[in-house]
């Protein structure tokens, strides 16, 4: 199994090598063009040599671009593999992507991000957090496009290991950003879990109607968990009727007995007869 530290070391090494390779290729390209423009004695021979070198370089760039595009297309399948539990297949492909050479960084960065997703799905929270931070450390356009999903993964991983300060920092960087609907739903779930852990119950029920509406758009398990947090917050604030209404909505979505295992705090609420 590929460890987070090994993957990051490999990624950083390959990024350094690709930078050096791009510089060397640029020097060769300039040399080839200069040779092709030679007009002194023997210039036509240098022109042929320069033209041949230029053709080889263009072929190399084309091949690298094709391989990068192919790797990026393969990477598009990894989230589906992870979501359906095909962890070994996803890991093999990610490992191959991180091992292959490319002068471009995009496929490597996608591999690192998807490895973070895989470790998160496997509940290996510490490794997921390390990988997310490695992605966020990259100051390139591709990394910026992965910043929001990486921060959401980072926040959840840190919540699971009890690092509330780190989770808050990750979440706070998302508040001022424009999020997709899926990202907004994930952020709401993380906000509620964080607020529950720190006892910020009034903040949890603030804007309740909008939160319930957003929960209705979520997958069943996420909708149940979101409304369960809202129900618990209302209960802690003494709003029994609201807590009961939200708790009943949770019961309509999931099996209460199984859900008590996932969220033991609901046992107290349901056993009291508030719901």
Feature names for model-found ranges:
Residues 198-275:
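Long, non-transmembrane cytosolic or organellar matrix-exposed soluble domains/tails
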